[in-house]
């Protein structure tokens, strides 16, 4: 047993230090990033925010809506190949180029991924997603998927330390997904005692990935636009959002009317709700590691994504970053004990 003494930080522990800026307006800030990925050689241009691959967030409807803003969607893995075929027929190139095809690591998952990717050459992203990215099986699976899809962009995770980021990139991942337990409906840290404060995880994993020419996704922990900006400031190339995009018309969650008000069900993908729906219940050898909540129905996602991107633009103006890619270079975080004045409640 050993104890690491170095302080680890989450988004709530810091604020950006403002810096002199030549920008006159938020409209001058460019949030578009351009990446050339390490293994596939693919080039991609867009706003590097991703809707999470949860079945009450990462829907086909969400993908079409967010593509209008240049934003990506990791479509959840519970759609059938037939569902994908219908989506591919109805979606334009810009939408398909901004979609990640999510998969687990079973033999059935591999075959399904092959079937889905064969539907269109415009599907270029594969998201290999398991809760514990420290498994040797994941490394082997990444190698297998890379061999089968040499020209596709492969994301794999989730992990929170630089050593495993490096191993996954060397195995063939272009992007590594970073985050264990920070999500709004995730209870892994409570059930297992395992985790890592998300901002420190992003900072350390970004350093490891960029040294090898890889990229990272900061997955989870964002509660407001300022947190999204902090993730980018910490070095995340992409930021994945679940709870911030849940509850919207496009999210695909179950609508429930209670006492005359409309709510949408939102749950973690290791929750009892998810396992009852997709796995026939919680297996006898495991515990549920997610919660189920009812969110007030929020209408269309377009206003919310504009608010998120507007917040990030404003961050950039405060620190003098004319482009999103400059934000991490312009970032100085200060440690704080308070974030905001809550005398009239939280926004």
From Swiss-Prot:
Catalysis performed (reactions): IMP + NH4(+) + NADP(+) = GMP + NADPH + 2 H(+)
The enzyme's E.C. designation: 1.7.1.7
InterPro entries: Aldolase_TIM (IPR013785), GMP_reductase (IPR050139), GMPR (IPR005993), IMP_DH/GMP_Rdtase_CS (IPR015875), IMP_DH_GMPRt (IPR001093)
Database matches in Pfam families: IMPDH
Keywords: Metal-binding, NADP, Oxidoreductase, Potassium
Gene3D superfamilies: Aldolase class I
Enzyme class: oxidoreductase
SMART domains named among the record's database cross-references: IMPDH (SM01240)
Active site residues per record: 186 (thioimidate intermediate)
Binding site for K(+): 181, 183
Gene Ontology MF annotations: GMP reductase activity; metal ion binding
GO cellular component entries: cytosol; GMP reductase complex
Residues noted as binding NADP(+) in the record, renumbered to the chain: 108-131, 216-239
SUPFAM superfamilies membership: Inosine monophosphate dehydrogenase (IMPDH) (SSF51412)
Any single biological process term in GO: purine nucleotide metabolic process
Subunit structure: Homotetramer.
HAMAP family: GMP_reduct_type1
Role: Catalyzes the irreversible NADPH-dependent deamination of GMP to IMP. It functions in the conversion of nucleobase, nucleoside and nucleotide derivatives of G to A nucleotides, and in maintaining the intracellular balance of A and G nucleotides.
Family designation: Belongs to the IMPDH/GMPR family. GuaC type 1 subfamily.
UniProt name for this protein: GMP reductase
